[in-house]
């Protein structure tokens, strides 16, 4: 295919995005398609839109899952979003590697992610960033970018970090608190928090046991002195 074909009618005037778009406020069951969608594709000409549409047609179910119901539990939203981005991002990379020349890669990466963004509330750049975090297993950054305001576990983590200096002081620990905060912030599973918070307690208990096992020297000295004082009387 010629380079002019790959540019997808780049010389054509891009269709402007309408300011108020009722059909973009959609649920998972109402996704705009065809001409209704291309009218709102800013920066995508009709030819470019058709190429993106045909190439991503096999992944329609993943495109739909980019716009999930608001009442869906957060755990499922994160799971479905990651799965969709992994599938779509991998498919886009295959297109770039096998069908594009070096100087065309940047253009078509931008166009394909822009097409994907039509099915999501997020912009193309945000979706690309989320895909990057998913691909490199940067879970913390992925969660921060996907749901910066919707994370109750973040407030819980913040409260734990505030309590950490007081806990260390109460247990008589004077270690590296900033290092402990860093470890706590990296934790994902709730069970791990309990393990970390119980470690100082166990060390405290072992300290107490060792103190109880120390010999009581003062009592032995008093007993010996008493025996010496009583010994002359017994001899007389």
Curated annotation (Swiss-Prot):
Keywords for this protein: Cytoplasm, Nucleus
Expression across tissues: Exclusively expressed in testes.
Biased composition (Basic and acidic residues): 198-212, 227-236
One GO term describing the cellular component: nucleus
Disordered: annotated span: 1-29, 197-236
Region (CHD1 helical C-terminal domain (CHCT)): 44-145
Subcellular location: Cytoplasm; Nucleus
Listed SMART domains: DUF4208
Superkingdom to which the source organism belongs: Eukaryota
Main location: cytoplasm
Ranges of Basic residues composition bias in the record: 214-226
Pfam family name, one: CHD1-like_C
Role of this protein: May play a role in regulation of apoptosis.
This protein's domain notes: The CHD1 helical C-terminal domain (CHCT) may bind DNA and nucleosomes.
Name of the protein in its database record: CHD1 helical C-terminal domain containing protein 1
Species assigned in the record: Mus musculus
Organism lineage string: Eukaryota, Metazoa, Chordata, Craniata, Vertebrata
